[in-house]
Amino acid sequence: FSSTLDANCEDKEASLYAATATYYLSLITKGEEHRHYADLTKKAAYFALSWYYLWDVPFAPGQMLGDIGLKTRGWGNVSVENNHIDVFVFEFASVLQWLSKEYAEPRMADFAEVISTSMRQLLPYEGHLCGIAKSGFYPEVVQHTNWDYGKNGKGYYNDIFAPGWTVAS
């Protein structure tokens, strides 16, 4: 389950691809084949969920993310090498909602809601520009640990790299 170009280690992104791909395969199959792909979707989703925070990282007074009240619960850690959180979700919340119905596991849908609401915290709009953001800009590298990418450190986000995928996700 490793896929990123910027990390040579385990990461959440490949598990999201696996969960999404097997989800679509389960939608177009029936019977035993459907069950096989649904079970693979569930397995990949559980692995992906292991990358998501179930608690809120504390920020010191004066750190931008703490000052704006960012809650890390529901955010996904990128990898063991790239130690920041980001909004790389795409269809994963929909996959979790489907799994919730498919397996009668309400906690899947519950956590899909946690992820969805958490991801909206840094969406900039007039009157809520999230510190250094501009309308339409969504940060990729949200620095919640002492690991520093060379821009402000913990409690800030790196505004140097914000590709279009953050908007698409």
Q: What are these regions, as identified by a protein language model?
A:
Residues F1-S169:
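Glycan-recognition and catalytic cores of secretory/periplasmic carbohydrate-active enzymes
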